[in-house]
Amino acid sequence: MDQPSPSAEDSQPERQSTGTRGTRFWAVFVSLCFASFVASLDITAITTALPTVTRELDGGENYVWIANSYTLASAVVQPLIGQISNIVGRRNPMIILMCLFALGSGICGGATSTGMMIAGRTVQGLGAGGILLLLEVIVCDLVPLRERAQYVGIALSTCALGISLGPLVGGALVQHATWRWVFYINLPCAGVALVALVLCLNVQHKREVSWGRALARVDWVGNTIFIAAICAIMYALVIGGSVHPWSSYQVLVPLVLGAFGWVLFHIFEASPYCLEPTMPPRLFRNRTSMTAYVLAFLAAMLMQWVVYFLTLFFQTVKGQSTTMSGVDVIPFTGFMIPSAIVGGAIMSKTGVYRPLHWAGFALLSICMGVFSTWDAGTPRAEWVILQCLVGLGHGLLLTSVLPAIQAALPESDNAAATSAYAFLRSFGFVWGVEIPAVVFNGQVDRFISRVHDATVRNKLAHGGAYSLAGTSFLSQLGDEADAVRSTYTDSLRTVWQVGMAFALLGFALVVVEKHIELRTTLETDFGLEGSENRAATSVEGVETGPVSKAQ
């Protein structure tokens, strides 16, 4: 049965009024939104700068690590951060994570080698992943489930704004200054965000009697197994097909070990030896939350898929500069903002989420199918309209998946459920670069024979085609330019077709979900500090009875 599980009897969380939002709520909310904007800006700013960064640091096929180290780091620590925030509260982890993000940005800006860049991106990812996770956790602490999509929609719209401006900012800085300022620009922004968090983020939590007791509650064994397993899997995926053949032991050994570790992690989490699991098995014991987790993974993967490879399309097939390629993807990234807000408002008003999921994946399927027909002659009106539609689809999914997960779970599981959701979303971001990169590199190697110049062929082969993207490369090719452009065009065609298949899978999986009534009351241990209101009210401010169960 898909219904909310009962909360622990010994817990008496605060039942907060939701009729009005006071000054303290908005101070917390705005500071969180600004912090998430700063962290989100760097997610896509690297997309337009990546070919230049890879070329200047002589990264070659390691360009996927520059992108993936950020998303991998942000993914693997999210369950740990979620659990720590449950134990020590939300405030201190959020402040530390913002400091980590700033430190990573400084390392990236001063990078003199690919290894240093990857290290900096890893530190950045640790901070940004935790910031975006705690943004949603804290909003869930302050807002009941029925309203949650609306407020999460507004909060994530600031993320979408950062994502929208990222390619433009990254391209402009690369073209008119230096790629290093793509990272240095984060430092003053992070400083402002840090001050806002210190002054405004005052939320309560149950304090342990000592730090030793608090640290003893952390699932260190489970998190160690989890992080090692995910890192092994991603290492195999990144080097597979580019550095080593998929059948080689260098790929198979970490892949098998990672898969074994993933299974071992879940066995340990379900065992009596794990007293406080990072990712409790009960999160996955009903079909609605389990399906919604898969949808979250697919939606995130396809979002990254579109962002990275639309930029590549404009730089190579359309011959745009890095700055203009950032401008050209604004219809996609920018349209997610109003779409996310509208989707959240629809869910808050109607209390339904399945139609939004169907509409979102239907739009992704159609648009990615049409993307596969694009070439150098595709008119501007077509690619603008299609990007708006795919942005609409992503926006609808952005705010509607998490409430579907939480609807079947008690409020006490909010942090754990949100952490698992954030991990799968971040893991999806990693796959959203890796899968299309593998497809793209394989297709380039397949079509590269049409290029007659052996020197050019060698530069394009084995992952080199991505790092060479940009008009400066194509303008130097002379008679070979058309052959190289057609290689990019046909390779991207297959990338979009594979993406369409994943979007269709998401559309089909919505059938498995079940409608569950969204709660209109809020019970939490992590409300605003100093709150004394313990009256349970509905969204409209009228007292309600017990939490509604599934229909």
UniProtKB/Swiss-Prot annotation:
Keywords: Glycoprotein, Membrane, Transmembrane, Transmembrane helix, Transport. SUPFAM superfamilies: MFS general substrate transporter. It is found in: Membrane. InterPro entries: MFS, MFS_dom, MFS_trans_sf. Its main location: membrane. The chain crosses the membrane at residues 26-46, 64-84, 93-113, 125-145, 154-174, 181-201, 220-240, 251-271, 294-314, 327-347, 356-376, 385-405, 420-440, 492-512. Pfam families: MFS_1. One of its GO terms (cellular component) is plasma membrane. One of its GO terms (molecular function) is transmembrane transporter activity. Glycans are attached at N286. PROSITE patterns: MFS (PS50850). It is a multi-pass membrane protein. MFS efflux transporter; part of the gene cluster that mediates the biosynthesis of aspirochlorine (or antibiotic A30641), an unusual halogenated spiro compound with distinctive antifungal properties due to selective inhibition of protein biosynthesis, and which is also active against bacteria, viruses, and murine tumor cells. Belongs to the major facilitator superfamily. This is MFS efflux transporter aclA. The lineage of its organism: Eukaryota, Fungi, Dikarya, Ascomycota, Pezizomycotina.
